[in-house]
Structure formats: C-alpha cells, structure tokens
Swiss-Prot record:
Naturally occurring in which organism (per UniProt): Sus scrofa (Pig)
Protein known as: Fibrinogen beta chain
Example GO BP: adaptive immune response
Modified residues (Sulfotyrosine): 4
Subcellular location: Secreted
Gene name, Swiss-Prot/TrEMBL: FGB
Functional summary from the UniProt entry: Cleaved by the protease thrombin to yield monomers which, together with fibrinogen alpha (FGA) and fibrinogen gamma (FGG), polymerize to form an insoluble fibrin matrix. Fibrin has a major function in hemostasis as one of the primary components of blood clots. In addition, functions during the early stages of wound repair to stabilize the lesion and guide cell migration during re-epithelialization. Was originally thought to be essential for platelet aggregation, based on in vitro studies using anticoagulated blood.
Main location class: secreted
Domain description: A long coiled coil structure formed by 3 polypeptide chains connects the central nodule to the C-terminal domains (distal nodules). The long C-terminal ends of the alpha chains fold back, contributing a fourth strand to the coiled coil structure.
Amino acid sequence: AIDYDEDEDGRPKVHVDAR
C-alpha cells in the first residue's frame, strides 16, 4: 500500500507498506 504523508516541513512524503 502506498500512503502519502506530510513531513515536519509540510513536504509530501510517501512511505510504502509491503504486505
């Protein structure tokens, strides 16, 4: 699953969860 989150600076960061 691919989720988009915001960093402390408000930057769009993507973390990939491999199931």
